[in-house]
A protein has these predicted regions:
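Structural flexibility/helix-modulation signal
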Residues: 1-11, 15-21
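C-terminal amphipathic alpha-helical interaction region
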Residues: 6-9, 43, 55
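Phosphate-binding P-loop
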Residues: 11, 35-37, 67
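Short, glycine-/Ser/Thr-/acidic-enriched flexible segments
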Residues: 13-15, 27, 37, 49-50, ...
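Generic recognition of flexible, low-complexity loop/linker segments
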Residues: 17-19, 30-33, 63-64, 79-80
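GG-anchored amphipathic helix commonly corresponding to the ABC/SMC/Rad50 NBD signature/C-loop
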Residues: 24-45
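Walker B catalytic motif
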Residues: 45-49, 53
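C-terminal lobe/lid and adjacent interdomain/linker elements of RecA-like ASCE P-loop ATPase modules
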Residues: 58-140
């Protein structure tokens, strides 16, 4: 009897590397899009930005989210690209008093309270956001 065997690899430059030789972040870039595109269950993802970079989030993860509008995917994240570019339907801003967690704000991406939460907590405040926007203005 032959056993099934799946060999997952990541194209790194011009070389395919087996998943067993990859870093945690590289493993996430291989597995996360597969999970998101082939599951019809509720998926909970806890802080993916801990192991993957913003380039992967904006180029691959967001695309996977937009292709899976029928699945319920719950993210715990500090990265504003995930709810904003992923066009989250519901956002819950959690806070803690040091003992207990509680919901500070909940609503759609376009609710003022949610916009304020995203800009303050995830972006570092409106001043930080404006400074980054000014920094990225590159003359061509």
């Amino acid at each position: 009897m032959l056993e099934d065997d799946i060999d997952m690899c990541l194209l790194d430059g011009s070389t395919y590397k087996n998943i067993s030789f990859l870093s945690t972040g590289q493993r996430c870039t291989v597995i996360l899009p597969i999970i998101l595109s082939h599951s019809n269950k509720v998926i909970i993802v806890d802080q993916p930005e801990d192991h993957i970079d913003n380039a992967f989030i904006t180029s691959t993860l967001i695309k996977s989210l937009k292709n899976n509008k029928n699945n319920q995917i719950i993210f715990s994240t500090h990265n504003p690209n995930i709810p904003v570019l992923g066009e989250a339907i519901n956002i819950i801003h959690l806070e803690s008093d040091g003992v207990n967690g509680y919901v500070k704000a909940s609503g759609s991406l376009y609710d003022e309270e949610i916009i304020d939460s995203i800009s303050t907590v995830m972006e570092g405040g409106k001043d930080a956001f404006v400074k980054r926007a000014e920094f990225y203005r590159v003359e061509s």
